[in-house]
Amino acid sequence: MVLVGYFVLVISIKDLVTHKIRNRTLLYFLSSLIAFSLFSQNAHVNPFAGACFFTIFTVLYLLSNALHKSGGIGFGDVKLIGVLAFAYFDSGLRSVEIFFVSLWLALVAHICLHLLICRKFPYRIAMAPDIFLASGLYLYAPIGLLLPQ
């Protein structure tokens, strides 16, 4: 858990500063999650969920860049969601729906905080902290929604 917290901090701070998520950092994060799942009995890895979330968010990435020339979701964010889905999420439409709602709640909170602090609408948003927050909300959701996890 400490290792995951380390990667959450490193990736979030780097994304807040540079608006980029390095592939090398994501590979180290994925490797540590795989190693953790091999040595832990209660960890589950779902490659299908990782591929499913990665595909859905890749389509969103392509649509957002095709419809809005200044960009939308970054591909580093798509890869981060794929890595987190590989380790923590379930596959299925209900899981995608819960993660979407969690991500939108985190993004709205991020934008509102930015508006309150800076008094202007942000041109670009570092989404890594919001993705990690949405993942936490997603993992907490089955308790309230009685979903299998």
Predicted regions and their residues:
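A membrane-topology feature that recognizes alpha-helical transmembrane segments
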Residues: 1-149
